[in-house]
């Protein structure tokens, strides 16, 4: 099973994915926990580049860097894990690119979606289920400001993050069979319990 966790800055995706992975392993599942951008040696190098606040990267170059990292990630890590029967949990995937670069970033949802869906062939490679950790953008940014070092996206204006939140919600509402919205203001363990109910329903 391929599980993706999406959400804006400060939504608690890392904590959630780690807790969900632990619970699934306790149930006897073999779990691969990964992230985007990243997940491979090349992907992690591209992650460092694209999040670096000292870099001035054009919108299209930024998009292509994310797609390059994803293509390598899918082929090197995600597909082999799924083919061996493991459960893959990924912190961000296509929809983060569609939202951040396409909707909030202004490149266009349809254009970015088409590229994302062709990153490893003619057929879109999609997760079995996507959890959206949703919270008001101001709350997410407040959580992030408690950190010392903010990356290029965390430093973007509130208007960008508001558009991103609206974009995620729009995608979720249009794909209710795949998407499940979780309240990121709730304790992580509560959200994980809710997610496990949804996952078990698919097994």
From Swiss-Prot:
Keywords of the record: ATP-binding, Kinase, Nucleotide biosynthesis, Nucleotide-binding, Transferase
Enzyme Commission numbers on file: 2.7.4.9
Protein name per the record: Thymidylate kinase
Gene Ontology cellular component list: cytosol
Protein species of origin: Chlamydia muridarum (strain MoPn / Nigg)
General function of this protein: Phosphorylation of dTMP to form dTDP in both de novo and salvage pathways of dTTP synthesis.
SUPFAM superfamilies reported in the protein's UniProt record: P-loop containing nucleoside triphosphate hydrolases
Pfam families: Thymidylate_kin (PF02223)
InterPro entries for the chain: P-loop_NTPase, Thymidylate_kin-like_dom, Thymidylate_kin_CS, Thymidylate_kinase
Keyword Magnesium: no
A single GO molecular function term of this UniProt record: ATP binding
Superkingdom of the organism of origin: Bacteria
